[in-house]
Amino acid sequence: HALAHTADTLMVFARSPHLDEAGLIRILKAIYEKMQAATGWIYVHGEDDRLARAVVTAFARETLTLDQIKNWLEVFSAGWKNAWTDEGQTRAYFNTRNLLRAIHIRTLSVKDLPRKEELSALILDAMTSMRPF
C-alpha cells in the first residue's frame, strides 16, 4: 500500500509551481519504471487511481507538450510481448493496463482539463496498443 501513499506525494509534487518540465518528466518516468517492473503484486488498494491523479495533475499543468505525453504513453504499450509467460510480468501488465484505464477515466472526469480530447485520444491509443502476447 506504500505505492498509494507515494502516488499521493507525487501528485503534490506535480501540482507544485516550483517543479519544472524536467521534474514532471522525472515523476512520469518513475511511475513508468515502477509499473513496468515485474512484481509479486496486483495492485488492489486504489494504487492505480491514486497514480492516475498524479499523472493527470502533471498533464493539467500544460508544462509538457502533447508529444512528450504521447512518447511517455507509448512506452507503456511496448515490451509486453510474451509477458504472459512470466507471472511477475503478467502482474505488471495488468497493473499497467489498470493504470492506463484509471488515467483515461480521470482525464474524462476532470472538469476544465486543458487538452482533454487530445489527452483522451492519446491514452486510448496506448491502451489499445498493449499486447501481452
Predicted regions and their residues:
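Eukaryote-skewed repeat-based solenoidal scaffolds used as protein-protein interaction platforms
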Residues: 1-64
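Terminal, non-catalytic domain-edge segments
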Residues: 63-133
